[in-house]
Amino acid sequence: MSKDNNSNSADKGGVNHAQANADTGANNATGNVTFALAQSHFLVGDINTNTDKMRKLAIEAREQGADVIIFPELALLGYPPQDLLLRPSLSGRVKSALSALSDIENIVMIVGYPHVDHHGTFNSAAILHNG
């Protein structure tokens, strides 16, 4: 895991941090919000392993002082998902994984996932915070 306010290079996985000023709603006395950017290899179709990895990264980021952790596009399912998006069981598996992630406290998580409804499948992001 690296803590680097100016890094944008990919590594073997971990969390990079950046700070931004916030007018309101900051969780700390400085008025800053610290963002963690998760970089890791998420396995295509392995929602359980990806969920476990995301939990570990979120907890690690929180312990290093992050207020928000941002995961990559479709991190929950892995990229590129290809024909996995056509499976009827996908929606239920994704909802279960998001529910499992939502119980992590004291950090906001932005999680890329495929949202399925009667209009189709959409590349989406969930914002999870304290359940």
Please state what every model-predicted region is.
Residues M1-N130:
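Hydrophobic structural segments
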